[in-house]
């Protein structure tokens, strides 16, 4: 029987700011069976896309992507916030509603032609996805898909990537 993951996501009104509904995945993470089931679904998706490596943006992308990579037996590459990686890095900036931010990856993290699936907890405006995809492509990788626990469809992040296969466990249309 399929799991309705939406039943296990807590909706928190006015967090972190008034008028925002925060979708909290920690109830899934706190339940080993749910966490494993969510990981398994994303891993099945990544396998179907031919993923050779999983990339997850800091920080919740680590929580989502690492177990997917482990289940598939492939590597995991973190896309980190600035000044967190010790060797030479590639950088990409992205916009937020209140400013901008930067993600970095080691320059040798992705091999040319390597097939990559990006895993993260949530896609809203897709700024993080843009930056992560740009990093991977600048390093010669091929982004073959992106997988999320949650997609906020009203924010139209998916529409910015008409040629990218995107998978989400849960969709909310009342972002």
Swiss-Prot record:
Primary localization class, coarse: cytoplasm
UniProt xrefs under CDD domains: PRTases_typeI (cd06223)
Keyword Transmembrane helix: no
GO-annotated cellular components: cytoplasm
Keyword terms, alphabetized: Cytoplasm, Glycosyltransferase, Purine salvage, Transferase
Biological process (GO), any one: adenine salvage
Superkingdom of origin organism: Bacteria
Record text on subunit structure and interactions: Homodimer.
Protein name: Adenine phosphoribosyltransferase
Gene: apt
């Amino acid at each position: 029987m399929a799991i309705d993951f939406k039943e296990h996501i807590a909706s928190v009104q006015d967090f972190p700011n008034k008028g925002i509904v925060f979708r909290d995945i920690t109830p899934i993470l706190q339940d080993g069976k749910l966490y494993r089931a969510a990981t398994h679904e994303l891993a099945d998706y990544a396998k179907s896309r031919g993923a050779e490596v999983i990339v997850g943006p800091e920080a919740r992308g680590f929580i989502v992507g690492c177990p997917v990579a482990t289940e598939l037996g492939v590597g995991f590459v973190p896309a980190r916030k600035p000044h967190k990686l010790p060797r030479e890095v590639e950088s990409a900036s992205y916009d937020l509603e209140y400013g901008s931010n930067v993600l970095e990856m080691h320059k040798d993290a992705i091999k040319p032609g390597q097939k990559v699936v990006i895993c993260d907890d949530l896609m809203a405006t897709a700024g993080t996805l843009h930056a992560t995809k740009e990093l991977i492509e600048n390093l010669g990788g091929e982004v073959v898909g992106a997988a999320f626990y949650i997609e906020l469809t009203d924010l139209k992040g998916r529409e910015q990537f008409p040629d990218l296969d995107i998978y989400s466990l849960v969709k909310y249309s009342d972002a």
